[in-house]
Amino acid sequence: MTRIFGTDGVRGLANGQLTAELALDLSVAAARVLADRGEFKGHRPLAVVGRDTRISGQFLEHAVVAGLASAGVDVLRLRVLPTPAVAYLTEALGADLGVVISASHNPMPDNGIKFLARGGHKLDDAVEKLIEQHLAEEWDRPVGGDVGRVTPYATPVEEYVAHLVGTLTRSLDGIKVVLDCAHGAAYEAGPRALRAAGAEVVAIAVEPDGLNINADCGSTHLAALQAAVVEHGADVGFALDGDADRCLAVDHEGNAVDGDQILAILALGMAETGHLAKNTVVATVMSNLGFVQAMRAAGVGVRQTKVGDRYVLEAMRVSGYSLGGEQSGHVIMSEHATTGDGILTALHVLQRMAATGQSLQSLASVVTRLPQVLVNVPDVDKSRADDDAVLAAAIAEEEAALGDSGRVLLRPSGTEQLVRVMVEAATQEEAVSVAGRLADVVKRQLAL
């Protein structure tokens, strides 16, 4: 059967590919699979459900809750809450299942459903495949007192904020911050957490109306944040995405600071305090070569994985690493979280600034980025990207010419019908030239 789950749960156009019926069926199937695996043995099963601010999240939440309750699962409704907050409360409340209704940084018309296992971790691929296999199957429905109870949870934001602030060891007093919440799930928790930690906060994009999530704001559109940091004379700015599982930054002059630089700042700070497990940071193959070189020069090891925060987290869990992340701003600090957490990331970058007395610009300068060009090639057969001999030969030829001063990465998208061509080189012109040539080969060889 066609896969429904992508690299980050189920995503699609709300009320298009992702309907209320599918949301209900997925929830029932998830409950059945976990029950068959013995996850609910000896107790009434419990799930927590949260969502972002998209207008479609309301009907999808009702469908998910209905599916779970009809399968005999008690449900705590967390309402609008960041993805990492749902993950935290899944663990803190001892829930058997967490459900996040969000399409993260995607445009407003999209939405998604992501399931979290007990402990707040994303479900394994194998479990997601079982859920797909059980979709719309006939089953013995619970009746009477065996159906699930649905209860609004009273204090999700308060408990999450207390958890975040509790991870810090010093006050952020005296630091002025602009925080862009993307009109998304962190519009309440984000400013509250930074203020509770002592920072002076100017909050922008905190007026969600169901339609404006990620619209010209947040981590995918930094211009508003850059302007606000300069306008308010702030020390630093942070941009979250719609579900607040990622964070990018802006220094006091309005210059963007990406996930690689943020990861480097945190890695060096954790290494200094003895909290960087195995003195190694986990990144993906998309991380800039300049980041890898900076870490190795500082004596910090780098373990690289496939693209996707789930693969970063998998490497961290299997090998016992404490820090990992992506260039896009997903940062996982496993001592404090089970998934990427944008607010947590911002707090710990601010703590590093407070501890060193250095500006974000100074801290980020440890990474000298190589020029990087990313070209998305749409409407091609991405399934053939790894098997085409002509394309492989073209990549090998370009890599040989780049030598140690650059690299090529070709990657099929996990969520869209396109292939990404990434090139790093000694100069921007060379990177653009190589990426353009390879994009042309991709279009020609992988044409539909």
Swiss-Prot record:
GO terms for biological process: carbohydrate metabolic process; peptidoglycan biosynthetic process; UDP-N-acetylglucosamine biosynthetic process. The active site is at 104 (phosphoserine intermediate). PROSITE patterns: PGM_PMM. Gene3D superfamilies: Alpha-D-Glucose-1,6-Bisphosphate, subunit A, domain 3, Alpha-D-phosphohexomutase, C-terminal domain. It is an enzyme of class 5 (isomerase). GO terms for molecular function: magnesium ion binding; phosphoglucosamine mutase activity; phosphomannomutase activity. Belongs to the phosphohexose mutase family. This is Phosphoglucosamine mutase. It comes from Nocardioides sp. (strain ATCC BAA-499 / JS614). The gene is glmM.
